[in-house]
Swiss-Prot record:
This is BAHD acyltransferase At3g29680. It comes from the Eukaryota. Gene3D superfamilies: Chloramphenicol acetyltransferase-like domain. One of its GO terms (molecular function) is acyltransferase activity, transferring groups other than amino-acyl groups. It is an enzyme of class 2 (transferase). Keywords: Acyltransferase, Transferase.
Amino acid sequence: MALNVIKISRVSLVTNSVEPLVLPLTFFDLLWLKLNPIERVTFYKLTESSRDSFFSSILPKLEQSLSLVLSHFLPLSGHLKWNPQDPKPHIVIFPKDTVSLTVVESEADFSYISSKELRLETELRPLVPELQVSSDSASLLSLQITLFPNQGFSIGTTVHHVVMDGKTASKFHKSWAHICKHGTTPQDFDLPTVLDRTVINVPAGLEQKIFQLSSYISEEKDYARTLTLPPAKEIDNDVVRVTLELTEVDIEKLKERAKNESTRSDLHLSTFVVSYAYVLTCMVKSCGGDANRPVRFMYAADFRNRLDPPVPLTYFGNCVLPIDFNGYKATTFLGKDGYVNGVEILSDSVRGLGSRNIESIWEVYEDGTKNMKLDTQNVTVTGSNQFGIYGSDFGWGRPVKTDVMSLYKNNEFSMSARRDEIGGLEIGISLKKCEMNVFLSLFTSDFDIYK
């Protein structure tokens, strides 16, 4: 995709503060220190907007409201720092800190780029900006607005995962949209104003275990002491993405299928459980290869209400923990019982979260990382049908589409609520073409069989 860069600006936040703010990182933040950034692009259709009106009216509103919303999300304008004398990195926010905003223009077909159909990953990559990262400093937020003249625009967001989780990221996007449309701060979003790290009560010693795990991730001697991110998977021209939909009726049929195929009556048949199990089995089958290869899969659980005392809803930062499944082989999910096996595993996990402590959950994740083999197939779900990203209306209508752009790099698939139906899901998939063809065949044919 050819882009014409219009400008690169630095957006400052509105603040009366004169002193720098230093935020230590908690266990929940440090977990994501070496993960690739959260990348999302959200598309907005403009039916009657010329190029001139966009730059004279719409863009200034987006910029002004961005400056205002940053005052409620202070850490996003700061930087991640790791000084040689410090045992761990921290976030530093200076009153005059700014966020990078790139404005570009593209002649690409907006309808195609923002569709749910198969699209080349390389065609969408230019729509998200990169973070500035060095060994001792990293920006935390970078934004890009791409205008498709007389068609629409997109907002590309890249966030360092160390600063916030998906729940807080969705609040940022929706709050920015609300301020842009209404000119006022939203009153019902539980804005993340609590920066006090002492509200995170976890056992001592867990933070150090994160750094000890670094030697299993990279053989580089100084890997644990640098902010530089690990090399991302290369995205070739044979990587494609698609957005699939599960209607509320589809999900009910998945639940009925689980009931019919399982001998158990105690299953936790939530939308999340049955949908994840279905996508997981399709992904394992589409990968091919050795049936005895290891399969490792994960999801992130919100621990705000699971800590003692609970974390305030207005806390700014990460509070999710990866729930790891690393003792399985592909054969578990390949046969006719593959789907119900996945349902039972995930059901037991979700239902048992309340009785598990953080140490035991961490130990499973630690073991999975230490013992992961080169031929391990990794599958992780990102996003949630609770985030409500399609509710972010900047004043020109709700998004027509949103894509998580970090799927292929992180071996993820995305899950979110459907735009136009309560109870349904959108599933974002990014795979090589050969795997995608098999995956789509399985996803649709399996559904036909069990309808």
